[in-house]
A protein has these predicted regions:
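Thiamine diphosphate
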Residues: 1-162, 167-168, ...
Length: 312
């Protein structure tokens, strides 16, 4: 269905289809419409595809105002500019006021590659997870993104979509059923649970093939919604396997690892291992290089998994 398609193309296909049928849907960019793929929407919907220039705070404030009048705004930028740069507007104008604004941050974490440390957001989930009334969602592939967008549009409230921008490794087929508030059991297993999000789901799958040859049966859960966390699916899996690794393309402070740790310390105390960015800024490089630098390779996952099992 989406073979070879970039995530931004899938997003724009949905927005185009939706704007054609719903005059209340609005897209607001901040000088990155070409990079995020929404530029051509201006020709078809010149009054509803808006570019505010390099003025992200205004983008968020305009969206909040339009939402208060019944519109359904989607705001887009690179992840650091869609989150930390407009944090106050997200907190007060959007979330405090419970406005129906969808915030899309593209190329999170190391997926920013060549834009360097200033354009790499390792902290966006940590910054936003503490803001009430906000759902945080990270689609794993094009199929999940496309199936999630109608659900997110219908959800009446603020949602942050942390989205890979280019071609993502396929995880799901066309028959995939999406539930915003239920994590996906991608692979069932009995020995250890790998809780992963975004680009790290593929690393979990690759590691599971290596571990399978060593007699280790891995369960993999795609935790696409980091807030609110699907506690039931996670706890059921960990009660079964009694071992856990958390994998995320984010700082290990404040993101999925922190959310899982907060859950387990209250409801299922256990020692777990983790893969992610170790409290540092990013740097320029292709993703394979950055994964190696950050300790996020398949081999790192294999090692962390064996360590988690040793804690049983």
């Amino acid at each position: 269905m989406f073979e070879g398609k970039e995530m931004r193309q899938v997003l724009c296909q949905f927005l185009d289809e939706t704007m054609a049928n719903d005059p209340k849907v609005v897209v607001i960019d901040a000088d990155l419409a070409k990079a995020n793929g929404t530029f051509n929407l201006r020709n078809k919907y010149p009054d509803r595809a808006i570019d505010v220039g390099i003025a992200e705070q205004n983008m968020a404030s305009i969206a909040a105002g339009m939402a208060s009048c019944g519109y359904k705004p989607f705001i887009l930028s690179f992840t650091p500019f869609a989150t930390r740069r407009i944090c106050d507007q997200i907190a007060i104008s959007i979330c405090y006021a419970k406005q129906n604004v969808k915030i899309i941050g593209t190329d999170p974490g190391i997926s920013a590659e060549f834009n360097g440390g200033t354009h790499m957001s390792m902290e966006d989930i940590g910054v936003l997870r503490s803001i009430p009334n906000l759902v945080i969602f990270e689609p794993v592939d094009a199929v999940q993104l496309y199936k999630s967008l109608p659900v997110i549009l219908e959800y009446n409230g603020p949602v942050y979509i942390r989205m890979f921008r280019k071609v993502a490794d396929p995880i799901f087929g066309d028959n995939y059923n999406f539930d915003l508030f239920k994590a996906d059991i991608v692979k069932e297993g009995t020995d250890v649970t790998l809780l992963a999000s975004g680009i790290m789901v593929k690393e979990a799958l690759k590691a599971s093939e290596i571990l399978k040859n060593e007699g280790i049966n891995v369960e993999i859960i795609n935790v696409h919604t980091i807030k609110p966390l699907d506690e039931e699916t996670i706890l059921n899996s960990l009660r079964k396997t009694k071992a856990c690794v958390v994998l995320e393309n984010h700082n290990l402070i404040g993101g999925l690892y922190s959310a899982v740790s907060e859950l387990l310390v209250e409801k299922l105390p256990m020692r777990i291992t983790k893969i992610g960015v170790k409290d540092r800024f990013g740097e320029v490089g292709k993703m394979p290089y950055l994964k190696e630098v950050m300790g996020m390779t398949t081999e790192d996952v294999v090692e962390a998994t064996k360590k988690a099992i040793s804690y049983k």
